[in-house]
């Protein structure tokens, strides 16, 4: 393993020395120096993690931190708009991306939009992911939100929830979503199992919003043109925070996590308080921030394995939400088991 890591790191380093910091014109979108250094930084972070570094060799964490610093020195910056950054190839936050255009587009929006719009609801978000988004005051959501007589159990959350997930009653592509079923159990909203193209409804009654171009028209000739982001500055900040924590520099770790939380506030100062924890509580905060900030960006699967926490977080019962619309228009919420997962440690590592 060490030999493989050394080879990969050396290849990325060589590439970074040959590539320019940016491309313009018809070459825009090609791999840059920043992309090579970012991939090197990710590789070194993985190599320093508990799965591959059981002795907690500090020199590996120091190498990961230094690699992240090399990327940060190139002048990238956090985009002010968390939702829109995934739609703009020119975002100052994007380090490595795959571009699309009118001729060579993709079907992401069709695959993941609601059945009521004509989509396939392919990414049905789990209740546990929805409830990973904090309340505005920084506390975690109370399960009682779904059993009390509330009109909106998703109100007052981390704004990243609304940029990442579509919940019942929220606007999506200009229309209020209807994941609910009527109390007769035979009819329901347009996005429910009784709605349009019922076979394509979301089994959890949530869908992904992140990466969606909500201005896309319902035409098979109109493919998605937004980029797929492989790496962005927020990941590098989180990589750096994690590495610095393990290097014993908790103040720096908190600083970089809080840069991300500041952006998540969307200009408000009264929500999502700064991370102030120390010790293992700080590490848990870093890991949690990574789960939320990088949700659906193909990190979590690898993160829980390199941290060796998969048997704690993935060996569980997972849920969706049923929403019943009463005759008076009020809605009743009930969580239901959708899947039971197992993870056998250490075999599955």
Would you name each region that the model predicts?
Residues 18-29:
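Flexible helix-coil transition and linker loops at the boundaries of alpha-helical arrays
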Residues 7-9, 85-146, 153, 223, ...:
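Long, intrinsically disordered, low-complexity segments
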Residues 19, 68-70, 257, 312:
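Domain-scale activation on soluble regions of proteins
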Residues 5, 9, 13, 30-192, ...:
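An aromatic- and glycine-enriched ligand-binding surface/loop that stacks and positions planar moieties
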Residues 158-262:
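C-terminal substrate/ligand-recognition segments
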Residues 16-17, 72-73, 261-262:
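Amphipathic alpha-helical segments of tetratricopeptide repeats
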């Amino acid at each position: 393993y060490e030999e493989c890591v050394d080879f990969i790191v050396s290849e990325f380093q060589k590439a970074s020395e040959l590539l320019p910091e940016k491309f313009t014109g018809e070459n825009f979108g090609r791999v840059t120096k920043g992309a090579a250094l970012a991939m090197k930084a990710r590789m070194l972070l993985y190599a320093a993690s508990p799965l591959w570094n059981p002795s907690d060799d500090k020199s590996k964490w120091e190498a990961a931190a230094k690699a992240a610093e090399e990327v940060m020195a190139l002048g990238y910056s956090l985009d002010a708009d968390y939702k829109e950054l995934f739609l703009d190839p020119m975002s100052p936050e994007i380090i490595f991306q795959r571009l699309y255009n009118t001729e060579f587009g993709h079907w992401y929006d069709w695959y993941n939009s609601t059945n009521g719009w004509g989509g396939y609801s392919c990414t049905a978000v789990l209740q546990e992911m929805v409830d990973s988004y904090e309340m505005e005051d920084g506390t975690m959501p109370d399960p009682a939100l779904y059993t009390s007589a509330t009109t909106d159990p998703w109100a007052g959350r981390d704004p990243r929830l609304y940029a990442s997930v579509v919940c019942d009653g929220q606007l999506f592509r200009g229309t209020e979503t209807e994941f609910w079923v009527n109390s007769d159990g035979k009819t329901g909203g347009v996005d429910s199992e009784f709605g349009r193209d019922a076979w394509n409804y979301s089994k959890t009654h949530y869908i992904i919003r992140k990466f969606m171009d909500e201005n896309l028209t319902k035409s098979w000739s109109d493919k998605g043109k937004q980029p797929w982001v492989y790496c962005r500055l927020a990941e590098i900040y989180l990589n750096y925070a994690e590495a610095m924590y393990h290097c014993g520099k908790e103040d720096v770790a908190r600083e970089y996590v809080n840069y991300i939380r500041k952006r998540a506030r969307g200009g408000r100062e009264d929500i999502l308080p700064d991370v102030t924890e120390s010790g293992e509580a700080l590490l848990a905060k870093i890991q949690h921030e990574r789960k939320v900030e990088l949700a659906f960006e193909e990190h979590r699967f690898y993160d829980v394995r390199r941290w060796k926490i998969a048997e704690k977080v993935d060996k569980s019962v997972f849920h969706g939400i049923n929403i019943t619309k009463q005759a008076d228009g009020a809605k009743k919420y009930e969580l239901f088991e959708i899947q039971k997962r197992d993870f056998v440690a250490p075999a599955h590592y």
